[in-house]
Amino acid sequence: MKVLVIGGAGYIGSHAVRELVKEGNDVLVLDALYTGHRKAVDPKAKFYQGDIEDTFLVSKILRDEKIDAVMHFAAYSLVPESVKKPLKYYDNNVTGMISLLQAMNDANVKYLVFSSSAATYGIPKKLPITEDTPLNPINPYGETKMMMEKIMAWADKADGIKYTALRYFNVAGASSDGSIGEDHAPETHLIPNILKSAISGDGKFTIFGDDYDTKDGTNVRDYVQVEDLIDAHILALKHMMKTNKSDVFNLGTAHGYSNLEILESAKKVTGIDIPYTMGPRRGGDPDSLVADSTKARTVLGWKPKHENVDDVIATAWKWHKSHPKGYEDK
């Protein structure tokens, strides 16, 4: 199968590329390298540098390479930044999706796996969150993901482009061999920031907010390991092509951990006492997000291998220890 991975040089996309290659697929990558890393891309994948909003380029790649399916990871994804710069997010994320669907329709490519988000749910009235939980995003990032899902649904009705939207909870960890992992600049995610602080010993790690409606006052999140996440993408693609139906799945472990619990787990995994300071809340952060992923486990046969957060952090630690400066290509 020929798969185009858009955003395939990014954190999650690069893991998808690697696993698709490992399974024997013919993999192509399109990435503008705004935030991604060329070094993260599996050398067996064919690489194009370009923007998802370049409809002509995307359409040409789809036609010339005779692509069977697309995986879409190319969206801005920082909640606080989206609150400060909403137009940047609507422009890139929503316009990018429209451009991609136009290109897919032009090239008669009918299968799309989309990187959606639990941010589409906003502040749920009850936990865990199922796929039927109402969508009510509280920040521009979550709203763009919701809009992208709705656009795909209309494109399915109008043009027959089938899609699977995978609503991620908090993605973490790295490849089990430690060769690729998370490298953002600036880094905003909790686990890599804790581990970077463990390596540097600078004592500059900050937890944002201790007045949330949770057991210890800090955010509670559901952490899904990145390789487990990619297993779900590949299962979803196969299921969609077999059934020729669009669908939506939550991807999480159904276990919620507070920021302070993650810090304690990181101390245990690393063997390092990691000091921290408590800062103010960040804009747009819900109190708790915990997934009910029964549907993915039942329909797709998804079986995450890293359900214990210590195991997730251990894979991230392996990457950060061996790559303390990330890919060093920026």
From Swiss-Prot:
Q: Which reaction does it catalyse?
A: UDP-alpha-D-glucose = UDP-alpha-D-galactose
Entry annotated with the keyword Transferase: no
Which residues are NAD(+)-binding? 11-12, 31-36, 51-52, 73-77, 92, 117, 141, 145, 169
UniProt entry keywords in alphabetical sequence = Carbohydrate metabolism, Galactose metabolism, Isomerase, NAD
Its cofactor is: NAD(+)
Its BP terms in the Gene Ontology are: galactose catabolic process via UDP-galactose, Leloir pathway
Q: In which pathway does it act?
A: Carbohydrate metabolism; galactose metabolism
| Induction line | Seems to be constitutively expressed.
* List of residues binding substrate: 117, 141, 170, 189-190, 206-208, 221, 282-285
What are its E.C. numbers?
5.1.3.2
Question: Where does the record place the catalytic residues?
Answer: 141 (proton acceptor)
Spell out the molecular function terms from Gene Ontology. Answer: UDP-glucose 4-epimerase activity
- Tell me, how does this one assemble? Homodimer.
Q: What job does the chain carry out?
A: Involved in the metabolism of galactose. Catalyzes the conversion of UDP-galactose (UDP-Gal) to UDP-glucose (UDP-Glc) through a mechanism involving the transient reduction of NAD. It also could be involved in preparation of carbohydrate residues for incorporation into complex polymers, such as exopolysaccharides.
The family assignment reads: Belongs to the NAD(P)-dependent epimerase/dehydratase family.
Q: What is this protein called?
A: UDP-glucose 4-epimerase
Instruction: Identify the species of origin.
Output: Lactobacillus helveticus
